[in-house]
C-alpha cells in the first residue's frame, strides 16, 4: 500500500498514527501534549489491524488533557501501556534514520530499544524501571544536601538488577543482528571490499553495575548525574576496523 498526495496533506501524520497504535507514542513528538490541537481537550487515534490467522484487532489510544493516557485493545483497557508494545510488531523507516549513523549514541540506543521491546517484555519493563530509578538517583546527586546513604544503596541495587537484564538483552540482540547487517550490506554493495561491523560497548562488560555506582558516588555528586550504566551504552559502527 502507498499514500500519494501533495505536501502538507497529512501523509506522514497517517504513518505516525499507525506507529502510535503500535508503540503508544509517536515518532515526531517528544510529548503526548503536542498531539493535542490548540484549544482542544483530548485526542483519540483508532485503527483496525488484520493479519493472517489472527483476524482483526482494534486498537484505540486516547488522551484527555491533564489525565492518564488510555490504550484499549478489542475494547479492553490495559493496566500498563507497556503490555501493548509488541502485540503489533512494526518497523518505521524514514529519512531521519540517517541519525543512526550520524547522530549521537542515544539514537542507536533508541533503535535497540525499539526492536528488543517488541519481542522481550522483560527487557521493556526493566528499561522503564531503570530510567525511572536513574532519574531519582540523578535528582539526589544534584541536591545540595548529601543524599541518604540507605536510599542511594536501594536505588543503586535496583539499577544494577535492571541494568543486567538490559545488558544481556542488548548483547544477545547485537550478536544476532550483526551477521544479518553484514549480509544485507554485502547484498547492497556486492563489489565493495569494505568490511562493516557492529560492536556493543557497555558497562556490562566491566562487571556488575552496583559496585561501580557505589564507588563513583562522591565523584558523580560533583557533576550531578550518573556517569555509569546502560544509559551510556553505545552501538559502535565500524568500517574496515575504524569507527564511522
Task: Cite the ranges covered by each PLM segment.
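Conserved NTPase motor "head" modules and their coupling/switch loops across ABC/AAA+ ATPases, GTPases
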Residues: 1-6, 19-20, 146-244
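Conserved lysine of the Walker
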Residues: 11
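Regular, well-ordered alpha-helical segments
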Residues: 20-23, 139
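Alpha-helix boundary/capping detector
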Residues: 40-47, 138, 142, 239
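Nucleotide-state sensing region of NTPase/ATPase domains
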Residues: 22-107, 113-123, 178-183, 196, ...
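Long, non-coiled-coil amphipathic alpha-helical linker/lever segments
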Residues: 31-32, 112, 119-170
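Short phosphate-engaging motifs
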Residues: 107-108, 122, 173, 205
